[in-house]
From Swiss-Prot:
One Gene Ontology term of the molecular function aspect: magnesium ion binding
Family from the record: Belongs to the IlvD/Edd family.
Gene name in the database record: ilvD
Modified residues (N6-carboxylysine): 121
Matches recorded under Pfam families: ILV_EDD_C (PF24877), ILVD_EDD_N (PF00920)
GO biological process assignments: isoleucine biosynthetic process; L-valine biosynthetic process
Protein name: Dihydroxy-acid dehydratase
Reactions performed catalytically: (2R)-2,3-dihydroxy-3-methylbutanoate = 3-methyl-2-oxobutanoate + H2O; (2R,3R)-2,3-dihydroxy-3-methylpentanoate = (S)-3-methyl-2-oxopentanoate + H2O
Cofactor: record remark: Binds 1 [2Fe-2S] cluster per subunit. This cluster acts as a Lewis acid cofactor.
């Protein structure tokens, strides 16, 4: 066993003494030691219940002859960090999580590891560590939140964000907003729509590193506890077989995950996260990989913010495997690859049925003939930008005058003050990985635009990123970012910007000579940052490579 290095032989008597100080017996130390990474905290609705999940996992480990040992890592709620300086720490926390798990697992030489998380950056941080460590491992989430109910309609946290703009526009009273606030999020779990957290949870199934139903079984359902127990039992089988992440996280696994992502109309953040996980797994992904797969993958699902359904509906429709079953009809799924279930994808799909065609459409009548995410290039984004086409109105081209802001706060103030007009292109820059630093999510401005009824008439372009709850003509991850002197740094108020969805282009319609003059005068915008953000800014690479640390 891997763990023998810390528990076998007379030289390890001091080590055993320390384990015994925690109540462990010789019998427990003779068994495989399974690390349980639990990101429980009292700060995130998706993590508040993870102690219960961890206890069920540990029960499963013990049932199958292992000794579970739990430790923790950090987590940030993007919703609570949204719209202020705290969001600068969200994406950077991904690297901290990966590094912290690596440190503990290497120090203790576990025989296997179970990773428990529910929300945005914690999941990819854990999967990065999983790929890096390459010991038998399995992931389980805490499950999605149920949608709330307000005035006879299902709602979620996105509804509340957009309601702020509605109040400012006089379309909703503050009293109604308070009631909505009370009813929108009825309990624990990752937010009820297909935002970043639930997209990533779905993709753990598609990648094959979690058990069936992990991506969609609700947080409060007993099914979630059963999955947790099964996960604890399954890690023991993975240890016995010595099946490692490198056996599962293959190029084909990432291709399948991207196909599922596109069929789901998933969060734009998945582009960053899948590239980061793939890098740790030694698999090369580029923006073009995403676009190539998106071009041949139909959008089969529209879950909030793109449509009226929620993750609960997807669960009732058959879950992630039901989407993969549909995609397999088009030859878009590699059915011979192995998963943590110790079954191939094809074996898992054999008995799967789609239970609700209204949620997962047949491939013969998709919402879109292509996938939900699109990569744009052009003079404003020479190295690429990302658009969630599944969450935009039927717009093929948009041309408007730039309204330029050097931070999110200034843009939100202008939007809520009524200073943004129909036809404007809101440009928010110096919010990239280096320039923010931290690449904040722009949910506050996009929600304000949508809440004020301008989502068909105003575009937003940024070198920052977006929440999975964002909808409308919102283009993020513009690369190179402003802090690196990218073209977005040279945009001035009144410049024309043209977005051509059909041609997959975003262009700054300014004379080349004029841009050369502006470039000659440009100076980097210096921000005073300290501590981790200062180190992060010095190490992080561009969004078009996943905003990972340079080698």
């Amino acid at each position: 066993m891997r763990s023998d290095v810390i528990k076998k032989g007379i030289e390890r008597a001091p080590h055993r003494a320390l384990f015994k100080a925690m109540g462990l017996t010789d019998e427990e130390l003779d068994k495989p030691l399974i690390g349980i990474v639990n990101s429980f905290n009292e700060l995130i609705p998706g993590h508040i219940h993870l102690r219960r999940i961890a206890e069920a996992v540990k029960t499963g480990v013990r049932m199958s002859g292992g000794t579970p040992l739990e430790f923790s890592t950090i987590g940030i709620c993007d919703g609570i960090a949204m719209g202020h300086g705290g969001m600068k720490y969200s994406l950077p926390s991904r690297e901290l999580i990966a590094d912290s798990i690596e440190a503990v697992v290497r120090a203790y030489n576990f025989d296997g590891i179970v990773m428990i998380a529910s929300c945005d950056k914690i999941i990819p941080g854990m999967l990065m560590a999983m790929a890096r460590l390459d010991i038998p491992a399995i992931f389980i989430s805490g499950g999605p939140m149920l949608p709330g109910r307000f005035k006879g309609e299902y709602v979620d946290v996105k509804t509340v964000f957009e309601a702020v703009g509605a109040v400012k526009a006089g379309k909703m009273s503050e009293k109604e907003l308070k009631l909505l606030e009370d009813f929108a999020c009825p309990g624990c779990g990752s937010c009820a729509g297909m935002f970043t957290a639930n997209t990533m949870n779905a993709l753990t199934e598609a990648l094959g590193i979690s058990l069936p139903w992990n991506g969609t079984a609700p947080a409060v359902y007993a099914h979630r506890i059963r999955i947790a127990k099964q996960t604890g039992m399954q890690i023991m089988k993975l240890v016995e077989e010595d099946l490692k992440p490198s056996d599962i996280l293959t190029p084909e696994a990432f291709e399948d995950a991207i196909a599922v992502d596109m069929a789901l109309g998933g969060s734009t953040n998945t582009v960053l996260h899948l590239m980061a996980i793939a890098r740790e797994a030694g698999v090369k992904l580029t923006l073009d990989t995403f676009d190539e797969i998106s071009e041949k993958t139909p959008t089969l699902v529209k879950i909030s913010p793109a449509g009226k359904h929620f993750v609960l509906d997807l669960y009732e429709a058959g879950g992630v495997l039901a989407i993969m079953k549909r995609l397999s009809e088009l030859g878009l799924i590699h059915e011979d690859r192995i998963t943590v279930s110790l079954k191939t994808v094809g074996e898992l799909l054999r008995d799967v049925s789609v239970l609700r065609d209204d949620v997962i459409r047949p491939v013969t009548r998709p919402y879109l003939s292509r996938g939900g995410l699109m990569i744009l290039y052009g003079s404003l984004a020479p190295k690429g930008a990302v658009l969630k086409v599944s969450a935009i109105p039927d717009i093929e081209t948009f041309e408007g005058e730039a309204r330029v802001f050097d931070c999110e706060e200034d843009a939100v103030k202008a939007i809520l003050s009524g200073d943004i007009e129909k036809g404007d292109v809101v440009v928010i820059r110096y919010e990239g990985p280096k320039g923010g630093p931290g690449m904040r999510e722009m949910l506050a401005p996009t929600s304000a635009i949508a809440g004020m009824g301008l989502d068909r008439d105003v575009a937003l372009v940024t070198d920052g990123r977006f929440s999975g709850a964002t909808r409308g003509l919102s283009i993020g991850h513009v690369s190179p970012e402003a802090a690196e002197g990218g073209p977005i740094a040279l945009v001035e108020d009144g410049d024309l910007i043209r977005i051509d969805v059909k041609a997959k282009r975003i262009d700054l319609l300014v004379d080349e000579e004029e841009l050369k003059e502006r470039k000659a005068k440009w100076k980097p915008k210096v921000k005073e940052v300290k501590g981790y953000l200062k180190r992060y800014s010095s190490l992080v690479t561009s969004a078009n490579t996943g905003a990972v640390f340079r080698e």
